[in-house]
């Protein structure tokens, strides 16, 4: 296989360069997107990943049309024969109502979504970055930043091998391989770069080391998921249930059943911290209780569960800022870019990676450090232009649905109204025409524009 970084022919080992134009820490969707676009522009990019592929990530595995657009833009083929399972839209169940909403037909986004497990998805996107010319190093843990003693600016990272004797590809057409500088597994070494992108997830130790902490005034979600063998594996809608309860109180979150198309389904639930129940919820017990209400023939039982129940935090609405400081740019979960409306973070991770790359490309083309820095300082504003007002609306939304009475009212009176629900789907998935469009598009875009940025 020769597409997206899987190179044919013999590989040869060479020693790694200790520097690059840009170091990207984390080869998830955001980091790999940034690395791809930077490498395509001809920059020397070192993409560092602490795990080795393939690896697991807690996720619903559902990809909205916004994420599909990013994949297409990276030249990734999305054929069902290659493991991409398409879907038509979302099915919502709640309050005795069941409604199917197709993804909107827009000129700006494809009219379909996909499902692909993160075990395969992340590697495909990372290999696309590798194929574009980025040097991908797997099994490498970043232990801290290298700082300029005078300015405090990040000039590189300190790394340590996981102990697997990792060998990593540089993405060259010949399939060259990059070996550790010191040749010893577990040895620390330093990589230097003009700029560093933090794409190291919700915990983002690199951001913390640079003094960037999470904001308590932004929403946070928690999601858990597992996998079952099930006859529902080939459902062509992403199914969501607004039926999570604490006693009789309806909670701000949803359960999901996403067919993967391979005989299995991703099943999980997510809850927002705007609920009074958030801190003391037993999520695994809630999942068991919810699944106990499902028809037996769907097969969601302990006997058909094929993976552990795993959980992860969902950092939302720019919950870590600033997104640029002293040579470090944040993308994806590291910058708290999960959509507060629906808990989806893959599309925004990939989009923010592309935005960061475009800012970096322009900045590094400047003739001096002062003008380069001026361009880099535009990155937070570029993110605010893309998401700021929309995320502020999202914060108001999650605050409202944190009240059980509001959640009950919205479910009872909103779901039976298809026109309202089509509007709601566009709002929650952030799927509108940027210019023109229908009345729903114009209303959503206007609200996002006039609302103060997050």
Language-model regions: role of each:
Residues 361-454:
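C-terminal helical "tail/cap" subdomain of flavin- and related membrane-associated enzymes
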Residues 128-297:
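Predominantly flavin-linked oxidoreductase catalytic cores and closely associated redox partners
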Residues 52-74:
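Conserved N-terminal glycine-rich FAD pyrophosphate-binding loop of Rossmann-like flavoproteins
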Residues 83, 275-359, 365, 371:
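FAD/FMN-dependent oxidoreductases across multiple families
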Residues 13-30:
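Beta1/beta-strand and adjacent pyrophosphate-binding region of the FAD-binding site
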Residues 68, 73-123:
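A conserved beta-strand/loop capping segment in the N-terminal third of enzymes
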Residues 39-59:
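Glycine-rich FAD pyrophosphate-binding loop
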Residues 30, 53, 203:
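Conserved Rossmann-like nucleotide-cofactor binding loop
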